[in-house]
């Protein structure tokens, strides 16, 4: 890790404070710079779906990554192993499967599917398909723009 764990906790606290002000319960952050800021994860794996989830009531963020990329998260982040979630290679280039379908299931399993969810709507790596998968898969959630949070 480039910084002490406390530095990441301080950053997380600032982000949660901004989330609270915007009425966001769950942040889905896809921007590689923001993922790094929150967790220390800095691998060049952003060419395919990945994100960090920040829930207002959780102590740590969750890294959601492709299976072949989680090794970097174990090394570069301060996160507990349980907060590094991998998706299977079956979601890679196998239309109609997509990693965000699995992400939606994770959100439902944690009972966050009725939350106010912040999305980085202007993030280069957040595609229209990712958005539609979340919107369709979580019909009871309120989706908000969390850009420049």
How would you label these PLM feature ranges?
Residues 1-149:
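A composition/biophysics-driven feature that prefers long, compositionally simple stretches
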């Amino acid at each position: 890790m480039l910084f002490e764990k406390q530095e990441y906790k301080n950053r997380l606290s600032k982000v949660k404070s901004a989330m609270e002000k915007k009425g966001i319960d769950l942040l889905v952050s896809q921007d590689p710079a923001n993922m790094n800021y929150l967790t220390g994860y800095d691998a060049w794996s952003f060419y395919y779906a990945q994100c960090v989830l920040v829930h207002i009531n959780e102590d740590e963020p969750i890294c959601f990554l492709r299976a072949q990329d989680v090794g970097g998260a174990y090394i570069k982040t301060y996160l507990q192993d349980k907060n590094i979630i991998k998706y299977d290679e079956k979601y890679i280039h196998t239309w109609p499967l997509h990693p965000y379908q699995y992400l939606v299931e994770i959100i439902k399993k944690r009972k966050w599917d009725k939350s106010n969810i912040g999305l980085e709507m202007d993030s280069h790596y957040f595609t229209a398909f990712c958005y539609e998968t979340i919107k369709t898969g979580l019909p009871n959630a309120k989706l908000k723009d969390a850009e420049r949070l």
